[in-house]
Amino acid sequence: MTPFRRPIVLATSASAPFPPAEAALTDPDGLLAVGGDLSPQRLLNAYAHGIFPWYSDGRPILWWSPDPRMVFRTDGVRLSSRFKRQLRASTWTVRADTAFEQVIDACAASPRPGQDGTWITAEMQQAYIALHRLGHAHSIEVFDGARLVGGIYGVAVGRMFFGESMFSGESGGSKVALAALAADLHGRGWPLIDAQVENPHLLSMGAERLPRAEFLHDVQRQVALAEQPGSWSQRYGEHAASDLCETHLT
């Protein structure tokens, strides 16, 4: 009989190391540790080791590193031919880091199949807003005029982007945000977007399952490549969403 295992309880110090991701449980898949806090130092340390927080309001903070791990190759995000035809006629525009708090708010408010309530608690929102103000968390935003119709946010460490959540205020808004993020990262030589856990929507857009060992190897390599933290807004500017039809996206 396999002995019952519990996740490791983290020390209270933000600088306390995480246990190796390979020590995560298989049931529930990927649960590694419990406790700690959501300070910028701890969050950045977690992502740099392939670990992310995911828990419900009123519960202890849970830290995860599932096996396999869902990822997007930045040259592998798929948009259907039908959606591309709609996009070519669209007047939507795309920006970066101009509405981070609106994006995370909208992600928290979006209903998710099979989930009762949101995992993006008020504590989580404040933690990622703090990371954004430090230049480590970023959003891609899709606008119809002045109205936000889609977005995605996540954390950048080195040349690795860790996606956290996305939303659609109108049909296709999250697809455009993800495709725009992938196109931008691909152009800058960033090969991967972490998508955390499997779901049918991600698979339909080209997400792949990576064995955790391979994912951790890729993360280690990419986070070691220095990138200056800071806002992406000025560098990114504003683009027509229809321009995505002319990129490398399949």
Swiss-Prot record:
InterPro entries with a match to the protein in the record: Acyl_CoA_acyltransferase, Leu/Phe-tRNA_Trfase, Leu/Phe-tRNA_Trfase_C, Leu/Phe-tRNA_Trfase_N
Subcellular locations according to the entry: Cytoplasm
MF GO annotations: leucyl-tRNA--protein transferase activity
Keywords: Acyltransferase, Cytoplasm, Transferase
EC number: 2.3.2.6
Enzyme class: transferase
UniProt function note: Functions in the N-end rule pathway of protein degradation where it conjugates Leu, Phe and, less efficiently, Met from aminoacyl-tRNAs to the N-termini of proteins containing an N-terminal arginine or lysine.
PANTHER family the UniProt entry points to: LEUCYL/PHENYLALANYL-TRNA--PROTEIN TRANSFERASE, LEUCYL_PHENYLALANYL-TRNA--PROTEIN TRANSFERASE
Family membership: Belongs to the L/F-transferase family.
Protein name: Leucyl/phenylalanyl-tRNA--protein transferase
Species annotation: Xanthomonas oryzae pv. oryzae (strain KACC10331 / KXO85)
